[in-house]
Amino acid sequence: MVNTWSDRIPSRRSEWVDLLRGLAVIVMIEVHATNVWYEGTVPAWLNFINGLVAPSFLMCAGFSMTLSTFQTDDSLRSFKEVLPRYGFILLCAYLLHAPGLALAQWTVLSTPQLFRELFKIDVLQCVIFSLLILQGLARCIRHRSIFGYTALILGIAIAWFSPYLWITGFGEWLSLPVRGLFNGISDRGVTALFPLFPWFAFVAFGSALGALYASCRTDIHEDQSRWSESTFIYVLVGVGLVIWLWGQWQKDTWLWTGTWVTDSKGIERLNGWTRGELYALYNQTLPSVMERLGWVFMIGGFLGSIKSRWNQWKLFSLLDIVSRESLLVYILHLQIIFGILLYPFISNLTGWGWYSQNEWGTMVFIIVIIGINLVAAAQWHKIRKQPSRMRRLQFQGLSILLVWFLVGHWWTYLYYLKSPELATEPYPFLNAARIRKGLTPTSDGMALNEEEFRREMERRGKVYPEATLKKKLEIIRGRQP
């Protein structure tokens, strides 16, 4: 039996990347569940681990893009082959931030702010826009090694210059859909979660690593590759350790050197930045990016190493399936959390609203939702091998979505027509509903004050969980003059 760990047989399959992507997707479920339900303060160590999910996912995307784009005969994979998938993922990305999947949510239950949320840059948008840039770069260069070096330099440059694009006021002249690509400064109530500066750097570094892997493990030299898989893994861990140490050494002082000066308005600035801006930029600097990238490399190397020793563990095959069905798991777990469990009717009925659980309750949610997604990924992976059945299920799913689009959420509209005081979004019909009830119109149609909200709540017999009620009242108080 051939030892694929130590042999030098050329290979285009890097298992540690699949394992890393699968693990990142599973931890992502924990991140969202914890942020939604845990009532306490998330420990710093868990916050740090959670902060490695997106860098891992983005790096893997760049790595896979290089291997799939540059063929063994030095040709490039046709862009027409990948464009439909890129388009589908981008469509899913924007639909996840759309006002909803029902006609009522796009019409009577829509608000200007809900439409602005459509342009929020999340991780899927970041992945696709980054890959489109790298695809264009690959087709301009058309040489894998030069592409790899260029991606490396580009990644360093993006991370280096990112803080300068996060200065307050930058990009105010840009339209909302474009501005979020550059920084995460809030604009008209919309904050980009994964702007290209600095998150594109992780995809670029992944592409550079993919070029190195192809050169060392895919290219044939005297009937074998330059390196074995084990050599590549050891180098990966070593590089990860070095850049992690450098990031640790530099991150606390990277932007904090120089002389503080006071401007004409009495605001202290260091190299043009205020203290608040410097604290906000802590995770947007080159050392911070390199620190997290180092951890990603080391974790990936560790997964590859244990996979070589315990290859038969079912956990690895499960992670591989999750990696292959990562888009399904990403969308499904968001719909379970935000579309079902946090749906007002469900959360009010169960008491499972925001910040409503202790450690054990949160853990139960995490385990159950991960379990559901693992089963769904495994089943869909099997179904994909049966094209006719897959197409039939896709047609049935689209039919259900169409019915939901036509009939969904009209009951919500009718509910707020009768009780506009309980609305927490400024729907355009609320003031007309208030006038019909003999109430004084307000600037946005919502409750005049907390007392009015509570009075209608008692009249309707509504009982909200404490955390949910607190959040609704904060919205009412926050908009009062």
Regions found by a protein language model. Give the residues of each.
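Alpha-helical transmembrane segments and their immediate juxtamembrane cytosolic regions
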Residues: 2-481
